[in-house]
Design a protein with these regions (language model features):
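Short hydrophobic alpha-helical segments enriched in small aliphatic residues
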Residues: 11, 15-16
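N-terminal non-catalytic cap/leader segment that marks the start of a structured domain
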Residues: 20-129, 288-292, 307
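A conserved acidic, glycine/proline-rich C-terminal tail/linker
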Residues: 25-30, 37, 247-284
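Short, charged beta-turn/beta-strand-edge "cap" motif at the junction between a beta-strand
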Residues: 46-48, 125-127, 168-170, 272-276, ...
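Short strand-turn-strand beta-turns centered on an Asx-Gly dipeptide
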Residues: 55, 231-233, 270, 294
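Glycine-enriched loop-and-adjacent helix/strand subsegments that border the catalytic/binding cleft
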Residues: 110-253, 258
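Generic structural signal for buried aliphatic residues
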Residues: 161, 267-268, 289
Length: 307
């Protein structure tokens, strides 16, 4: 289980041409499961992480919109208390006419959350109780550059969808996993390779990109989710999650055997088969990588130069 590491500090919000959020996040994507959907982000408020929600393509400060001093100020805290009145208060605030008074101008979006832990197997079959144990990976957000590891000849790219738990979970069946999930987000995972294609360095050498938002389960049907991955504008892979969603549920069920999974734990799985012989998976410095999903938006990152 990977323990994501937050950056030591965050740059302050910068000026921009308008108040629209920089990453591409849909203003609305329908109400798939009958409840008002929420697309939750974290933005930089004077150097601190702050909970926001997307409304008409803009960031709304959710704690200010709710107006209660006990309402969570971060997405991590929101996940920990994401049942009953907290969810109701958030939805009610976003539905009020005066919610536009709380739109954040020139919002700079950060990684939406730092999961308590993040399991990143290459496939459900590769899951083991100790996979990733004790390792730390730095987390970056949308529109941030990926620092190039000094030992890498090239990077392998693994686009993934992550489910964030909203309830404590133990010994759960696959069929019961969906109701325990808080929401979904996108993950771009990278593996440093040498010239012969073998992994090099440590697994914490390349940060994980997460974002651009977390969509709550009431606004997202994972089995119907359509994803597309691009490199420098050219399509790398696309497809519907379909069976991959059930594989993700199975991954969580397997991880819950004999242990307690906590709120805020996240599990990510790639919907596209890995092919080591695919030259398009070899990424080089300067490549622009985009992972898009209906209802979530586009996670966009550029690979940095060689050090």
């Amino acid at each position: 289980m990977v323990s994501p590491r937050a950056p030591a500090e965050h740059a302050r919000a910068h000026d921009g041409p308008d108040s629209r959020v920089q990453p591409e996040i849909p203003a609305a994507a329908g109400r798939m499961l009958g409840l008002p959907e929420m697309r939750l982000v974290t933005y930089d408020r004077r150097g601190h992480r702050r909970l926001g929600a997307i409304l008409d393509g803009r960031v709304v400060d959710l704690p200010d919109a709710v107006g209660h001093p006990a309402f969570p100020a971060t997405l991590e805290a929101f996940v920990q208390s994401s049942r009953g009145t907290v969810l109701d208060a958030a939805r009610a605030a976003l539905a009020r006419p005066d919610v536009k008074d709380h739109v954040v101008k020139r919002a700079r979006v950060l990684p939406p959350l730092f999961p308590r832990s993040l399991l990143l197997p290459t496939s459900p079959e590769s899951l083991s109780p100790t996979e990733g144990s004790g390792l730390e990976r730095r987390v970056i957000g949308p529109e941030q550059d990926v620092p190039w590891p000094s030992e890498a000849a090239w990077l392998d790219y693994e686009p993934k969808v992550a489910a964030v738990l909203g309830l404590e979970t133990t010994d759960v069946d696959t069929e019961a996993v969906a109701e325990r999930i808080f929401g979904y987000t996108l993950v771009s995972d990278w593996v440093a390779k040498d010239a012969s294609g073998d992994p090099v360095g440590t697994s914490d050498g390349v940060p994980i990109a997460i974002g651009p938002c977390v969509v709550t389960i009431d606004g997202c049907d994972p089995q119907a989710m359509f994803l597309q991955a691009k490199v420098d504008g050219s399509e790398l892979a696309k497809g519907n999650l379909n069976g991959s969603a059930r594989s993700l549920f199975g991954l969580i069920a397997a991880a819950s055997r004999g242990t307690v999974l906590e709120r805020g734990d996240a599990f990510a799985l790639g919907p596209f088969p890995a092919r080591d012989d695919d030259p398009n998976r070899r990424l080089w410095p300067g490549a622009l990588v985009e992972l898009a999903a209906e209802g979530i938006g586009t996670l966009r990152n550029r690979l940095g130069p060689r050090p």
